[in-house]
From Swiss-Prot:
UniProt keyword Repressor present: no
Lipid addition sites, S-diacylglycerol cysteine: 20
InterPro entries assigned: Lipoprotein_3
Lineage of source species: Bacteria, Bacillati, Mycoplasmatota, Mycoplasmoidales, Mycoplasmoidaceae
Annotated signal peptide: 1-19
Main localization, broad class: membrane
Family recorded in the similarity comment: Belongs to the MG439/MG440 family.
Protein name per Swiss-Prot or TrEMBL: Uncharacterized lipoprotein MPN_650
Domain of life, per lineage: Bacteria
């Protein structure tokens, strides 16, 4: 049970940063963040630097506090498009090789 909680942030960050690279979803995500936090973030720069990743995550937290359903919808749509386009590698989502304690 502990493993499930420990692996969640790692999986979430891999899905988040691969999802943010999608062009269509990037525009939706950028407008969502601008609506809720009044910040105009460059997503391509945010994903490539550690400081940018921290800013992106804090902006998404603020956005989720303001409008949770829209934020979740945009992120799930981004993840779906990333999987469909093959941007998320199978090693990140392959649960069959994991050893549970």
């Amino acid at each position: 049970m502990k493993f499930k909680y420990l692996s969640t942030p790692l999986l979430f960050s891999a899905l988040l940063f691969s999802a943010c690279s999608s062009v269509n979803v990037g525009a939706n995500l950028k407008s969502l963040i601008k609506e809720t936090t009044d910040q105009d973030l460059d997503l391509s720069e945010s994903v490539s630097t550690s400081e940018g990743k921290k800013n992106l995550i804090s902006s998404l937290k603020k956005s989720y506090e303001t409008n949770p359903s829209k934020t979740a919808s945009v992120l799930l749509n981004a993840w779906k498009q990333s999987v469909e386009n093959g941007q998320i590698e199978s090693s990140e989502t392959n649960w069959t090789n994991w050893k549970f304690p």
